[in-house]
Amino acid sequence: MKVLASVKRICRNCKIIKRKGVVRVICIEPRHKQRQG
């Protein structure tokens, strides 16, 4: 899980979702998981 100020899609499987007010990227590739912080 990367904590970044700016979350971006890395590949076409990445999905940007908002969960409890936190912007996250979920993907089938575990290394692409991100959270805005």
Swiss-Prot record:
Q: Does the keyword RNA-binding apply?
A: no
**Does the UniProt entry include the keyword Ribosomal protein?**
yes
Q: Which GO biological-process labels does this protein carry? A: translation
For this UniProt entry, the molecular function terms from Gene Ontology, in alphabetical order, are:
structural constituent of ribosome
Give the stretches traversing the membrane: none
Mention any one GO cellular component term assigned to this protein in its UniProt record: ribonucleoprotein complex
Q: Name one Pfam family in it.
A: Ribosomal_L36
Q: Which UniProt keywords apply?
A: Ribonucleoprotein, Ribosomal protein
Q: Which InterPro entries match?
A: Ribosomal_bL36 (IPR000473), Ribosomal_bL36_sp (IPR035977)
Q: Which family does it belong to?
A: Belongs to the bacterial ribosomal protein bL36 family.
Q: Which NCBIfam families match?
A: rpmJ_bact
The record, for HAMAP family, names: Ribosomal_bL36
Query: What is the designated name of this protein?
Result: Large ribosomal subunit protein bL36
Q: Which organism is it from?
A: Janthinobacterium sp. (strain Marseille)
Q: What's the name of its gene? A: rpmJ
